[in-house]
Amino acid sequence: LSSKEWQLSDIGEWAAANADRIVIMPRAIAATKRSTFEQPALLFECLDLLANEYTQVKTGKADRFAFKNKADSLGLDFGGSVEPSVAGEMGDLYFVRWHGRRQFLDQHLCKGNARDPRFCMRIYFFYDEDTQKVIVGHMPSHLPTSTS
């Protein structure tokens, strides 16, 4: 699969082909198809990083540097998305329904700090211990952090 040059419009196909390693929620697929982000190869590389190294760290198959070193080499920042109190003020933006439960997209992987969606990427996700998969709820744009 990695030999194909994936475009943002291919995200549904990519998600289906990789569903055994990572889950891309329908709203993340829809937002990606509408996106103007200019580095699709980076987005797919980040999804691979979450499906591979991040999941290996979470399942104890790799130490955290396996993920951190690759994220650093791609110029990515990784961390918590927003405080739960902020997320609560934003309605359902920071939450997805997963296996009948409301789940907080508590992590994000990001590149760039400009608000311009052509140059800035955010992948909001949570890790599901039961399935041992990353669940991506929104990408590749910023989610708002206040109601202003």
Stretches with model-predicted labels:
Residues L1-M121, D128-S148:
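Basic, Lys/Arg-enriched alpha-helical interface segments
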